[in-house]
Amino acid sequence: MQELIRPDGSTINYEVLGSGEPVLLLAPRGISSSAAEWDNYFVDPRVLADNFTVITMDQRHAGASRAPLAPFSHNDVFADQIAVLNVLGIQSASVIAADFYCASALKFACEAPARTRSTVLIEPMGLDDSNTMDVYYAVFNDSIRQARAEGLESVISAAETNPIFVDNTEAGPWCHRLHDQPGFAQAVRSLGRETYIALLVDFRDGAFPWDKRYFSVNELEVCNASVPLLITPGNDELHPAGVAGQLHKDATNASLSVAGRDNPDKLLEEIRKFLQENN
């Protein structure tokens, strides 16, 4: 993978596969979104590299990328994604996102339509009548509890066992960096317990702001977006079907996929056709 250094010191790793019209992939697994997470997902759009230039990336809190000790910001991760396209000289691309980073794909559609040819949302997260913010805040409960009850040394020790936050929430959202860069532990220690806990809360609230149904953009922005959207509904509290349905209703140029987890091969066919029609 290639590495891009961002103004705030973050490093973003990305890889280019295939040739053809550009498609940016934003992987599943929440904060732990790295290109490798496509390996075990029910559908792997990297196979589109047989017809398209596919760009994969590790988001700043995952994989080989690195993030500073700062709250999560949808603006920051969106800027990372734009920066990857810029360094590759890509003026516009289609965007395929799964899970949490559908929020970034929506920012492409709503805030950068000139850079966005089409957008595919696979099982987007968000709020509807079937869930509450507690569903998303729960991911951080163990992080806060571990630091408060056991202290920062226990957080650092937890990170040594597993660098993937969604599988090791006690270690906090910087666990991939603590795992791979032992010297980073001193930066965590220097915060002190209470400041670290406050930072976790700010990180959580930045990732899942209570006042935005889709987390990164508001409903009016979605209503005003004209970029073609293909949406695959989820079927659980984290990925409610109602969120996909509301997006389909709000957006002016959106369609729902026929296939989903029940038929990933058919879903890939739908995605391929959608990209070909909107490139």
Regions found by a protein language model. Give the residues of each.
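Conserved HGGG/HGGXW glycine-rich cap/lid loop of the alpha/beta-hydrolase fold
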Residues: 6-66
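Active-site loop/oxyanion-hole signature of alpha/beta-hydrolase fold enzymes
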Residues: 46-47, 55-94
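Short beta-strand immediately N-terminal to the catalytic nucleophile in serine-hydrolase-like folds
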Residues: 95-98, 122
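Gly/Ala-rich beta-loop-alpha elbow adjacent to hydrolase catalytic centers
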Residues: 97-105
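Flexible "cap/lid" loop of the alpha/beta hydrolase fold
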Residues: 110-111, 116-149
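Conserved alpha/beta-hydrolase catalytic His-Asp/Glu region
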Residues: 149-202
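Conserved serine/cysteine hydrolase catalytic core
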Residues: 193-245, 257-266
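Catalytic active-site module of serine/aspartate enzymes centered on a nucleophile-bearing elbow/loop
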Residues: 249-279
